[in-house]
Amino acid sequence: MKMIIGRKIGMTRVFVGNDSVPVTVIKAGPCVVVQKKTVEKDGYNAVQLGFEKAKKVNKPLAGHFKKFGVEPMKILREFRVENPDEYEPGQVIKVDVFEKGEYVDVTGWTKGRGFAGAMKRWGFSGGPKSHGSKFHRELGSVGQHTEPAKIWKGKKMPGRYGNERVTVRNLQVVDIDPENDLLVVKGGVPGARGGLVLIRSAKAPKK
């Protein structure tokens, strides 16, 4: 499986044939393999990647990097893999591991929107807009009657909206710029400009 860590730069449009296609530009890598985990030793197979050099690290992390002979990195993320023996600590993974035209899954953290009402958070239609109505943007009934005399857990209500981990699947790689570590994918990816994104080979690619 191919994987890399990056940061979202922003969106633009490119021409593919006669079509204008919306794309997201991602600064992807270079990443360094910090640690590989195996079923025998750790209970599962995974590879730990580091991204962006760190100026300061605490002592436990400094010891972790020293153990594997890798420079301290700012971001550490794990990716599950089937065969961790393909990777070694210190190995560099660049954006050119991906190919133009292949499909990837991109994981990011959505924009945090703070405390939001039910209409914005869940898309509720709200109350009547006409004169005489006493609720316009409220969510309406939230329970039943004497029984069960409570609101069920999981009821869609006002609350904090956004800042959630979301994966968008099957985004096509439109272009790659290895010199500048840029990956261009078709469509949008979660998060604000400068947000961290995890890119891996599509789990169920389009045929």
Swiss-Prot record:
Protein name: Large ribosomal subunit protein uL3
Record flagged with keyword Ribonucleoprotein: yes
Keywords attached to this entry: Ribonucleoprotein, Ribosomal protein, RNA-binding, rRNA-binding
SUPFAM superfamilies (alphabetical): Translation proteins
GO MF assignments: rRNA binding; structural constituent of ribosome
NCBIfam families: L3_bact
HAMAP family in the record: Ribosomal_uL3_B
Taxonomic source organism: Thermotoga maritima (strain ATCC 43589 / DSM 3109 / JCM 10099 / NBRC 100826 / MSB8)
Entry's family note: Belongs to the universal ribosomal protein uL3 family.
GO cellular component annotations of the record: cytosolic large ribosomal subunit
Single GO BP term: translation
Gene: rplC
